[in-house]
Amino acid sequence: MNHNRSTLNELMADISRKDVERLVKRRSPIKEADLTAMNLEKFNFEGAIFTKCKFTGSTFIGSDFAFSRFEECILDDCEMYGSHMQESSFIECDLSKSDLRDCVLIEVNFRQSILHSVDFSGSFIKDSVLLNVKGDLCDFSFTSLSSANFSGAKMHVCDFTACRSGDLKAADADFTGSEFIGAHLDSSLLQGTILNFCNFSEASLQECDLSRARLLSATMNNARLNTSILNEVLLMDAKAGGTELNDVNLDNANLTKADFSKSIFNGSSMNGVLDQDTIYDGAKLEGVIR
């Protein structure tokens, strides 16, 4: 049996869709196969195992990836629109420039994968793991990111506009230069997260833990951060006009040169705050503890 599998792997460059279907149905692991530009539309990958395979330019539109496992695979420039993934794994894979719009991803593991210019817009992503992923220019606009875990991820200049992401976990992640306009991120854990130059205008970050987060030159106009934890946060040179900061912990925060015009700080704790040249024009600071 082992000899037959090794022979199959040597011939994978010429593998057909029917061959893949047969191997997947038999639960046979597929290794080091070249599946470049293959049409795998509406394919049933349930329980499939792929290791170090190349799928560059392949089509997976409407496919079912339930309980499948991909390790060290190249899945770049693939069409995966409208696919369903439940308890699937893409460990140390490269999904750069792939289209995952309007997909359903439940308990999917993308740990340590490369996500350059991946389009997740409009997808439903729940309880999924994106630990230590690396990427930039990704599109998560209008996605649902319920309980997703981005801890340790580096996702620069990505678009999270209007995404809904309650209970997001992203401790020590780096989202430098990303857009979160109108996003709903309530109850998220963002301790030590790098959010420099990000735009949170009109976003909701209520009851979040942003302790030690870095928001250098961030834009937060009309954002809502009520009852959030922002102790030791860096908000230097931030633009936060009209922001709601009721009952917030800002102890030892650095607000130097930030603009909080017409913002509301009622009932907040601001012990040890650095606010040299900070603008509070028209701000409300009733019951603030300093």
Where are each of the predicted segments found?
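Tandem repeat scaffolds
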Residues: N4-R290
